[in-house]
């Protein structure tokens, strides 16, 4: 890793904090309400807007793959750094490339002969369970899928 890249990774690590921890039922309720409001706004986004956000999130996740891998090992005490980095990279790049052209907003399929339309609508706020064995790659995967489908995830 070049000195420039190492500095960039170190700077990124400093911005990734645990400041969003929820430690009470009241905090959780407030967070859920905020997420619900944000998701309602996001549910109105166009396919073009969603795709732009999806790409930006995948790119950001891929850039953060090294510090996220380090943090996962520090927090769980499990894993091999290089393996975590590869999993994070795979989660970001593969999911983006697999779904970047998928229609996820509005009418996604139409059979004019039968008058049938398939419409993609978000579910709303969904819960994401994260295993200790692969915390960061799982969060990357689930977050990207939630963004692509205009859902919010907690």
Where are these regions (language model features)?
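Conserved small-residue-rich beta-alpha loop and adjacent elements
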Residues: 101-154
